[in-house]
Amino acid sequence: MTEPLRIVFAGTPEFAAEHLKALLDSPYEIVAVYTQPDRPAGRGQKLMPSPVKQLALENNIQVLQPPTLRNADAQAELAALKPDLMVVVAYGLILPQAVLDIPRLGCINSHASLLPRWRGAAPIQRAVEAGDAESGVTVMRMEAGLDTGPMLLKVVTPISAEDTGGSLHDRLAEMGPPAVVQAIAGLAAGTLEGEVQNDELATYAHKLNKDEARIDWSRPAVELERLVRAFNPWPITHSTLNGEALKVLAATLAEGKGAPGTILGASKDGLIVACGEQALCLTRLQLPGGKALNFSDLFNSRREKFATGIVLGAAVDAQ
């Protein structure tokens, strides 16, 4: 009887943990899991294990958390595991060529975009922000370059007008794992050929940062509506209202003209705010010290805060 493939898995967030779950249910042997070192989290800044580490420990799998894979000791530790294949999903550490050369069948990666579009750290959010019609998962062979390797398999999903960064993430987290299992079977059988990426079509998905989430009301409403969806659940788009932070969690396009940031009107349906082109109807907001609420609830209890003519973003920056 043929020995099962020996697989080393490397990943960190929940997206990666969903892939590890699928591999644990596959016929392959997961000999070890690599994940990033525990990080401080929450109000107490207590050290917390990654979702991948938690899942590995629950299944009695060896967990390795080197701060880097660039040194000889870390590479020797990996080689000692005698992996046939390394599966990498949102690991967060660079794998040098010396590491890529260790597994017998090389290293493969599950990337949350339709490569070569959106190489890099935030492909899901950038696809929503850009107004892309579709997204998906690409399983590829890894090279030393960032998300540049030959593509083995793609699965595609449309991006709807209601999709947020969170909803698209969750959908891709369901689609990616079976694609990885299918790709591994093809590699093991020697039936899967890689397709070289066209670098001329490549775009780069820069890492998200909070500064980007500050709403610039001079931009067209169509761009801001996509930004609101892309940055939910993190980092959440925001502005200010009478000098207080105002988080914007949902919005739709609306008709209206005025100086950018000016409140044009309010009703139970939403808060209409002028943009550089057209207007935005803010439908879900969060005020300081409160929870996120549909605007209809805020309108009933705090109507005076949203008077026509007030300019959002006119005072201090939101945090």
UniProtKB/Swiss-Prot annotation:
Transmembrane segments: none annotated. GO terms for molecular function: methionyl-tRNA formyltransferase activity. Gene3D superfamilies: Formyl transferase, C-terminal domain, Formyl transferase, N-terminal domain. (6S)-5,6,7,8-tetrahydrofolate binds at residues 113-116. Pfam families: Formyl_trans_C, Formyl_trans_N. Its EC number is 2.1.2.9. HAMAP family: Formyl_trans. Belongs to the Fmt family. Attaches a formyl group to the free amino group of methionyl-tRNA(fMet). The formyl group appears to play a dual role in the initiator identity of N-formylmethionyl-tRNA by promoting its recognition by IF2 and preventing the misappropriation of this tRNA by the elongation apparatus. This is Methionyl-tRNA formyltransferase.
